[in-house]
Amino acid sequence: MKKCMIIAVALAAAAVFAGYAPEVWNIEARKEFASKRFGVFIHWGLYANYAQGEWYLQRGQLDEEAYSRMMYGFCPSCFDAREWVRIVKDAGAKYITITSRHHDGFSLWPTKVDDGYNIANTPFKRDILGELAAACREEGIQLNFYYSLMDWHRMDYPAGFLTKTILNSRERKDDYASYKKFMLGQIAELIDSYRPGIIWFDGEWEHAREIDGKFTRTHDWQLDSIYDFIHERRTLVANNNHQPMREREDIQLFERDLPGENEGGFSKGQPVTLDRPIEQCDVIQKNVWGYKIAEKSFRSAADVVAMVVRAAAKDSNLLMNIGPDGSGQFPAEAVATMAEVGKWFKVNGESVYGTRAGGVGKGKSVVSTRKGADILYLHFLDPAVNVFSFKLEGKVVSSALLDGGKPVDTVLTADGLLTVSLPKTERSNGFGRVVKIRVAD
C-alpha cells in the first residue's frame, strides 16, 4: 500500500513540474467518477435508420452526400428520454455517455455553429440531448458526451487514412484552424447548455501510426488548448486514442480491453495509468456499437456482471454500450439483459461501487475488490472454483456471502495463508458468488 501511495505522489509531482496541475474540483470529479464503476454507452444517430451499424457510411461505401440525406427521414417517434434513463438506472448504472456527434458528423442537438447537419433539421426536430439531460438530472444519473474528432461530413476536417476512403464529390479544404473553431463552438454549446460531466473524444487515432513499435502522432490537434478550454468550464476530458495518456487527460480509456490485457487488440503500447481513473468500454450487441438488425448475438447478464466485476478488480469502470434502433428504442434483448444485471446490483452493488482493486485473485476465476483497509470482496466467477487461498495480513473478523448473508468458512494458518471455501449449496447461480470479508490488524 505504501509503495502504491509513493508512486501516485511521484506521478502527481511530475505532472506539477511538467507545468500542469489539476485543480481541486478536477481531482474531486475524477474520484467521484471512479466511484461510479458502471455506466451505459449509447451510440445513436442517422446510422440507426440504416440498421447496419455506426460505420455503415464507410463500410458500406455509400456516397456521403446521399447518406446525409437520411437526415430528412430521421424521426425516432418512440424516443423517450425518461424511459432510457429508467432502464439505465434500474440496471445499476450510474452514468450515461451518448454520441453527441459520431464520425458521420451529424449532431444530436440543435447546434448553431454547423451547416445545418443536426437534429433541428430532421422531421423529429426535438432536442435529444436536452431531453436526456433533463431526465438524467431528475434521476441523479451523470450525463457525458462522446464527441468525434474525426468528421466524414465537413470538408475543412484534415482527412486521415480512414476519412480519405469516404466517397464524396465535394472538394476538400483541410483547414484545421476552421475545423478547430467549429469544434470549440460545438463543445461550448454542449457544456454551457447541458452541463455534462465529461467530454469523451474519439477518432484521434486516425492521425497516428505505429513506427518501430511506438505510436507517432501525425497531426497536431492542439489538444492541450482544447483540453484547457474544457477544463475552464469545469468538465473532465477523456480521449479514446489507444495511445499513452497526455497529462491534461483526466480518464484513461481502453476500448474493448481490460487495462493491460490487450485482448481486443486496441491497447498495444498503451501503459496503464497509476494516478487517474480508468474506464473500459464494450458492447452488449457483440460486434457493433450502433444498432445492426442482422446482429442477433447479445451478451448475457452473467457476461455483463463478470465484465463489471473484472473491471472493478483492475480499478476500472465499465461502460457497456447499447445501440438504440431507428425508432429510438433499445433492443429488447439488451433491455432484458440489463434488467437482470440490475437485480444483481441490488444485492451485490456494494462490492463494486466505491471500491478499489483488491489485489488478490486467480486469473479470471476469482477476482477481488476492497473498501478501505478492512473490507475485502472476493468474487468467485468460475463455478468450478469453490476454494481460494491467499496471503492475508491481519485476522478475519467475519466472512459471509453478500447474497443471503450465509457465513463462509475461512481457515487462517500461522504463516498468514487464508483459505476461503464456499458453502456447497451456494457454489453457482450463473453470476458467481461474492464473499465479504471483514479484517482487522
Question: Which stretches of residues belong to each language-model region?
Answer:
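Positively charged n-region of N-terminal signal peptides that target proteins for export
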Residues: 1-4, 88
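Sec-dependent N-terminal signal peptides
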Residues: 4-13
